Amino acid sequence: MRVALSVVGKFHTFDLARELAARNALEAIFTGYPRFKLRNEGLDADKIHTFPWVNTPYMGFPRKERLGNWAVELWEYLNCTTFDAHVARHMPPCDVFVGLSSSSLQSGRRAKAMGARYVCDRGSTHIRHQDTILAEEHA
């Protein structure tokens, strides 16, 4: 089985990548992180595909609050959609594609069109459910 992964940041997806690599099942992992930040991830460099052009400036910008909510939200949207489009354009042949829900709509469609199974990974529960749980706990 060949598995391709997509994550605009790092999160738990790199743990999954290491487990898949240990079983010779990792085809590729796409990330918005710059390559120099990934040297100690324990993965073969040829399996890591980076697209840091929007995410790195976003992460490094020290005063996002001065931009206003609309600008930050637009930047986050562009970060996810440009990354997703990049992954869709560079999708390798694979049996399974796992992408985080915020940035894998186009790439998930591309993977399915190529015959792969698509797993839309939601790293946490829905925000409405989180709010409900917190309200119950603090009532």
Predicted regions and their residues:
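N-terminal subdomain of nucleotide-sugar transferases
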Residues: 1-51, 88-92
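Short N-terminal targeting/anchoring amphipathic segment
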Residues: 4-7, 87-104, 110-121
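Short, solvent-exposed loop/turn segments at secondary-structure junctions
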Residues: 10-12, 33-36, 102-105, 123-127
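A short acidic, amphipathic alpha-helical/loop segment
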Residues: 16-19, 106-110
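Short loop/helix-cap segments at secondary-structure boundaries that form the rim of catalytic
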Residues: 38-42, 108-113
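Acceptor-binding helix/loop patch of EC 2.4 sugar-transfer enzymes
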Residues: 56-74, 114-139
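Conserved nucleotide-sugar donor-binding subdomain of glycosyltransferases
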Residues: 59-102, 139
